[in-house]
Amino acid sequence: MATSREMTEGRALPLIFNFTLPLLLGNLLQQTYSLVDAAIVGRFLGINALASVGASTSVVFLILGFCNGCCGGFGIPVAQKFGARDYVTMRRYVAVSLQLAAVMSVVIAVVTSIYCADILHMMSTPENIFTGAYYYLLVTFIGVPFTFFYNLLSSIIRALGDSKTPFWFLLLSTVLNILLDLFYILVLGWGVAGAAIATVFSQGVSAILCYIYMMRRFDILKTTPAERKFDGALARTLMYIGVPMGLQFSITAIGSIMLQSANNALGTACVAAFTAAMRIKMFFMCPFESLGMAMATYSGQNYGAGKPERIWMGVKASALMMIVYWAFTFCVLMFGARTFALLFVDASELEILKNTELFLHISVSFFPVLGLLCILQYTIQGVGYTNLAMLSGVSEMIARILVSLLAVPAFGYLAVCFGDPTAWIFADAFLIPAFIYVYRRILRMKKN
């Protein structure tokens, strides 16, 4: 039997730290794959092919972000019932979440595939890259069920306190993805569509193997026929938690698309600098996201176990780890931003290098605000208040839209650099009082 891990006993800091490490490695793996995938497409298929993939990225994030958010939400009741040692209800939640995933993923795949071309036309996709973007997007949308199940199974396993098993399946998916990228593009000559097929196929294989492993190795998840029956009440609970988390990702994506569009109007140098800086920033942001994901499981289990005071202990421990990491990252990016920028552009591109440095220096200065955002947002989600977490996403969207419409026309690229930090500040201004409200409420619930 594979080991699940209860996070309701023991010191919070080592528990969260050990749980975070595999999540961090997984997130770093995803960012590394993103870079390699772009390099393969760009170097072997050319600039237009790379632009075709880029033209689809924001829409893919919009749709897959919703799916991934729902999967994370579906794992929260599982974590809560696991923490409460109510294993029968936990298994029923797992069964219903799989049933919901089947219906939702097929509906999303069908609708988005039908309107794929219309979506690209609405985004004013240039004609010279339209065909490549269309096939890349179409294959990605057709593969939504594989992506949905892969992320749902990983979420369920993490809910049981096991963050290592999802990492190994992510590693398998990444290696297979890169190998298939090379095979489909270089050997079969399938072009941009081949890159999308490689991603969908590798996630499909990983999802199937993950399900087989989960059912064979986690005895606690083996269901009876009665436990596998669809339950409307449980389905409503899952949707109540999962859909707001999905919408949170999609809402955030809308604000990011607006900021990207405003930056596009500033010229090639700003676009290139923004692209390079975002890739670097996303890599260094991984620990914050990983800490947040760990807090979702930690808070969910302790909420289910009736130990809300441990949630505050977890927040303090996570904040301490976040500050230590930020101090390290601040030094690295303040003195090494240009070195990282040189991974993307030649040393002669002085304007791009300067703009990349500026973006990274401003972003890293506000990383503690981002770290607190991730910790509080995921903690609130973990105890089931996903609507509040979604509203923090709305706060981010509003901030980015305001920066895009009001600040960028007046201050140019400098305003773009402050777009994300402004969004983080807006979100924290909402999340801090929201967390205080939620924490006090669950303390009162325990007393009553």
Model regions and ranges:
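Small-residue-rich hydrophobic transmembrane alpha-helices
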Residues: 50-110, 147-166, 273-337, 370-392
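Signature of the first transmembrane helix
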Residues: 14-75, 79, 243-263
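Short runs within selected transmembrane alpha-helices of multi-pass transporters and secretion channels
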Residues: 71, 139-158, 166-174, 195-210, ...
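Transmembrane helical elements of multi-pass membrane transporters/channels
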Residues: 18-34, 139, 150, 173, ...
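Short alpha-helical transmembrane segments in multi-pass integral membrane proteins
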Residues: 1-20, 78-143, 187-243, 299-366, ...
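Helix-terminus/linker motif at the lipid-water interface of multi-pass membrane proteins
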Residues: 28, 32-51, 120-127, 183-190, ...
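Interfacial/gating helices of multi-pass transporter permease domains
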Residues: 41-61, 127-132, 192-193, 234-241, ...
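Hydrophobic transmembrane alpha-helices of multi-pass small-molecule transporters
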Residues: 62-65, 109, 177-181, 207-211, ...
